[in-house]
Amino acid sequence: MGAMSPWHWAIVALVVIILFGSKKLPDAARGLGRSLRIFKSEVKEMQNDNSTPAPTAQQSAPAELPVADTTTAPVTPPAPVQPQHTEPKSA
Protein backbone atom coordinates (compact mmCIF):
# COMPACT_ATOMS: atom_id res chain seq x y z
CA MET A 1 0.00 0.00 0.00
CA GLY A 2 3.01 2.29 0.55
CA ALA A 3 4.43 1.79 -2.95
CA MET A 4 3.05 3.84 -5.79
CA SER A 5 1.49 1.87 -8.62
CA PRO A 6 1.85 2.90 -12.27
CA TRP A 7 -1.61 4.47 -12.10
CA HIS A 8 -0.48 6.74 -9.28
CA TRP A 9 2.51 7.87 -11.34
CA ALA A 10 0.26 8.53 -14.36
CA ILE A 11 -2.05 10.70 -12.26
CA VAL A 12 0.92 12.62 -10.81
CA ALA A 13 2.31 13.20 -14.33
CA LEU A 14 -1.09 14.38 -15.58
CA VAL A 15 -1.42 16.84 -12.68
CA VAL A 16 2.08 18.21 -13.32
CA ILE A 17 1.32 18.69 -17.04
CA ILE A 18 -1.93 20.45 -16.23
CA LEU A 19 -0.34 22.72 -13.61
CA PHE A 20 2.77 23.74 -15.52
CA GLY A 21 1.65 23.35 -19.11
CA SER A 22 3.40 21.47 -21.88
CA LYS A 23 5.47 24.49 -22.98
CA LYS A 24 7.09 25.17 -19.61
CA LEU A 25 8.07 21.57 -18.85
CA PRO A 26 10.86 21.27 -21.49
CA ASP A 27 12.31 24.61 -20.39
CA ALA A 28 12.22 23.52 -16.75
CA ALA A 29 13.90 20.21 -17.59
CA ARG A 30 16.56 22.00 -19.63
CA GLY A 31 17.26 24.42 -16.78
CA LEU A 32 17.46 21.55 -14.30
CA GLY A 33 19.93 19.72 -16.57
CA ARG A 34 22.15 22.80 -16.84
CA SER A 35 22.09 23.29 -13.10
CA LEU A 36 23.08 19.68 -12.48
CA ARG A 37 25.90 19.92 -15.03
CA ILE A 38 27.27 23.05 -13.35
CA PHE A 39 26.96 21.42 -9.93
CA LYS A 40 28.84 18.31 -11.09
CA SER A 41 31.64 20.38 -12.59
CA GLU A 42 32.00 22.42 -9.38
CA VAL A 43 32.11 19.27 -7.24
CA LYS A 44 34.73 17.75 -9.56
CA GLU A 45 36.79 20.94 -9.39
CA MET A 46 36.63 20.98 -5.59
CA GLN A 47 37.75 17.34 -5.45
CA ASN A 48 40.68 18.11 -7.75
CA ASP A 49 41.64 21.10 -5.60
CA ASN A 50 41.63 18.96 -2.46
CA SER A 51 43.54 16.04 -3.98
CA THR A 52 46.40 18.09 -5.46
CA PRO A 53 48.01 20.48 -3.00
CA ALA A 54 48.65 23.97 -4.22
CA PRO A 55 52.20 24.48 -5.49
CA THR A 56 54.24 26.17 -2.83
CA ALA A 57 57.13 28.52 -3.32
CA GLN A 58 60.56 27.07 -2.82
CA GLN A 59 61.30 27.04 0.83
CA SER A 60 64.90 28.08 1.07
CA ALA A 61 66.77 28.70 4.28
CA PRO A 62 65.63 32.02 5.70
CA ALA A 63 68.16 34.77 5.40
CA GLU A 64 69.58 36.07 8.63
CA LEU A 65 67.52 38.92 9.89
CA PRO A 66 69.29 41.90 11.42
CA VAL A 67 69.27 41.71 15.18
CA ALA A 68 67.27 44.50 16.75
CA ASP A 69 68.62 46.47 19.67
CA THR A 70 67.37 44.56 22.68
CA THR A 71 68.52 46.98 25.36
CA THR A 72 65.74 48.84 27.09
CA ALA A 73 65.62 51.72 29.49
CA PRO A 74 65.06 50.81 33.13
CA VAL A 75 61.41 50.69 34.03
CA THR A 76 60.33 52.62 37.09
CA PRO A 77 57.41 51.11 38.94
CA PRO A 78 54.30 53.25 39.10
CA ALA A 79 53.66 55.16 42.29
CA PRO A 80 51.32 53.33 44.65
CA VAL A 81 47.78 54.56 44.60
CA GLN A 82 46.34 55.42 47.98
CA PRO A 83 42.62 54.87 48.32
CA GLN A 84 40.63 57.98 49.03
CA HIS A 85 38.57 57.78 52.18
CA THR A 86 35.18 59.27 51.74
CA GLU A 87 33.05 59.73 54.77
CA PRO A 88 29.35 59.27 54.34
CA LYS A 89 27.49 62.52 54.39
CA SER A 90 24.93 62.84 57.10
CA ALA A 91 21.57 63.97 55.94
From Swiss-Prot:
Matching Pfam families: TatA_B_E
Gene Ontology biological process terms from the UniProt entry: protein transport by the Tat complex
Molecular function as annotated in GO: protein transmembrane transporter activity
Keyword RNA-binding among UniProt keywords: no
Segments of skewed composition (Low complexity): 51-74
InterPro entries on file: TatA/B/E (IPR003369), TatA/E (IPR006312)
Main location: membrane
Membrane topology listed for this record: Single-pass membrane protein
TM stretches of this protein: 1-21
GO cellular component: TAT protein transport complex
Chain spans, region Disordered: 44-91
Protein family according to the UniProt entry: Belongs to the TatA/E family.
NCBIfam families, A to Z: PRK00575.1, tatAE
Complex and partners: The Tat system comprises two distinct complexes: a TatABC complex, containing multiple copies of TatA, TatB and TatC subunits, and a separate TatA complex, containing only TatA subunits. Substrates initially bind to the TatABC complex, which probably triggers association of the separate TatA complex to form the active translocon.
PANTHER family in the record: SEC-INDEPENDENT PROTEIN TRANSLOCASE PROTEIN TATA (PTHR42982:SF8)
Protein name: Sec-independent protein translocase protein TatA
Species this protein is from: Rhodococcus jostii (strain RHA1)
